[in-house]
Amino acid sequence: MKWRSLEESSTGPDIRPLREIYAERKELIAKYVPAETQAVHEQAIAELKSRKLAANILPVGSKAPHFVLPDHDSKAFSSSDAVLNGRRLLFCFIRGRWCPFCVGQMEAMNIILPQIERTGATFVAISPQTVKQSFFMHDQHKLRFPLLSDAGNKVARKFGLTYRVPARQEAVYRRAFVNLPFTNGDDSWELPIPATYILDRNGTVLYASANEDYTERPEPAEIVRVLRDDPGA
């Protein structure tokens, strides 16, 4: 089962909606992944939704916690530096390079990066994977923005995003060679639910979107629209 990149699947200069790309990937999963495996993932998502994690994330209007994290080249990135430089900060929490939906989202953000930067915003992505894994992801997908490593999900936890992978889903991941202890450098089997934040020039949350369903992400066009509609924030 091979995922097509957004550039491979594009029919023109404009980026296709993520929902279309994700629909194609879901079709491949339905075709090639055993039904019992799909059921485990669906149950895990349902359990997360029952806990209402997305409803309890750090909300719009809150002062965002400051963070300093290493990027894919081990260079320190400070959220305060972006704010002090008078730029808004856009960042996505993702699960890792092993997740096709995270990869699709990052490819989409890569395509619209010039539009993001023209609004006067800085974009970074954050995952719990190690710096080495972030380097591999950055290199493989030719990403043009910093990919930060949040060891132990310390920053994601401050935003209310973390959960422990259920035992049955952990077993499925292990069989599929998704080795989170190796990828993330710890044995916690913790992940963040996918989330997207925009901080204004004062470090206050201007936009917040999260979903317990890792197959659902905000459309890149929506994010650019928020940045354009509030240029002075």
Question: Predicted regions span which residues?
Answer:
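Structural microenvironment flanking redox-active thiols in thiol-disulfide oxidoreductases
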Residues: 105-158
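Generic structural signal for well-ordered beta-strand positions
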Residues: 77-78, 206
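Thiol/selenol-based redox catalytic cores and closely related redox-interacting motifs
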Residues: 150-216
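Short active-site neighborhood of thiol/selenol oxidoreductases, capturing the structured segment around
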Residues: 79-109
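N-terminal targeting signals for export/organelle localization
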Residues: 1-63
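Non-catalytic interaction/Regulatory regions outside core domains
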Residues: 1-12, 19, 52, 146-148, ...
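A short, polar/charged loop-to-alpha-helix boundary motif
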Residues: 212-230
